From Swiss-Prot:
NCBIfam families: PRK02101.1-1 (NF002541), PRK02101.1-3 (NF002542). Belongs to the UPF0246 family. Pfam families: H2O2_YaaD. One of its GO terms (biological process) is response to hydroperoxide. GO terms for cellular component: cytosol. InterPro entries: YaaA (IPR005583). PANTHER family: PEROXIDE STRESS RESISTANCE PROTEIN YAAA, PEROXIDE STRESS RESPONSE PROTEIN YAAA. HAMAP family: UPF0246. The lineage of its organism: Bacteria, Pseudomonadati, Pseudomonadota, Gammaproteobacteria, Enterobacterales. This is UPF0246 protein YaaA.
Length: 258
């Protein structure tokens, strides 16, 4: 089983590391090409392209400038410990044991606009480059055209290495769009998380993102290997709703706290 999650905008390069083990990203030649393109942008252009403040644009221009192809524990940290968004709040990788990291390294991948595909222990230098950004490059008008089949091929390699053919899609639509489902050698299972609000169940972004992290942690902690085992997920009040689920989509609901 291969879990896919999105990266996060919020990064943490200060907290103590809970493991010293690391690997290197496998698509750095591609990353370097994108850095070359990104370095052409001025901070005002970055601000417009990414729809971020002038201050954040300045920070990210500096990150593009400071990025270097030689990754070390001094200038980078493990991706799963560097990302700190809602998904990662649910995942809580900072509490993982070494055995958890072993399982995660084999069974979880983070999709990334700059790095393509990251394994949990891959070193990552700080960046912000969301997959949906229209950054023109030598291969096309945006990052989807830049990555083409590369991300899908890398995921197929990971599936072949573990001798499995199931992908658990816990990534956002923006990021999963970088994967070519018809070329992916896998059955795709998508968990969906609905929260009750005023008597109706719907996707509430903050809760859904955290739930994706909680589901990832549930799979890792319990060393799950079969998609039907996911229906046992019950973290923080969620329950499986078989009636609302269909082939390829597992629906989990949570009642409003009263």
């Amino acid at each position: 089983m291969l879990i896919l999650i999105s990266p996060a905008k919020t990064l943490d390069y200060q907290s103590p590391l809970t493991t010293t083990r690391y690997t290197l990203p496998e698509l750095l030649d591609n990353s370097q090409q994108l850095i070359h393109e990104a370095r052409k942008l001025t901070p005002p252009q970055i601000s417009t392209l990414m729809r971020i403040s002038d201050k954040l644009a300045g920070i990210n221009a500096a990150r593009f400038h400071d990025w270097q192809p030689d990754f070390t524990p001094e200038n980078a940290r493990q991706a799963i410990l560097a990302f700190k968004g809602d998904v990662y709040t649910g995942l809580q990788a900072e509490t993982f044991s070494e055995d958890d990291f072993d399982f995660t390294q084999q069974h979880l991948r983070m999709l990334s606009g700059l790095y393509g595909v990251l394994r949990p222990l891959d070193l990552m230098q700080p960046y912000r480059l969301e997959m949906g950004i229209r950054l023109e490059n030598a291969r096309g008008k945006d990052l989807y055209q830049f990555w083409g089949d590369i991300i899908t091929n890398k995921l197929n390699e990971a599936l072949a290495a573990q001798g499995d053919n199931v992908v658990i899609n816990l990534a956002s639509d923006e990021y999963f769009k970088s994967v070519k489902p018809k070329k992916l050698n896998a059955e795709i299972i998508k968990p969906v998380f609905l929260d009750e609000k005023n008597g109706k169940f719907k996707i509430i972004s903050f809760y859904a993102k955290k739930a994706r992290g909680l589901m990832s942690r549930f799979i890792i902690e319990n060393r799950l290997t079969k998609p039907e085992q996911l229906t046992g997920f019950n973290s923080e009040g969620y329950f499986f709703d078989e009636a609302s689920s269909s082939n390829g989509e597992l629906v989990f609901k949570r009642y409003e706290q009263r």
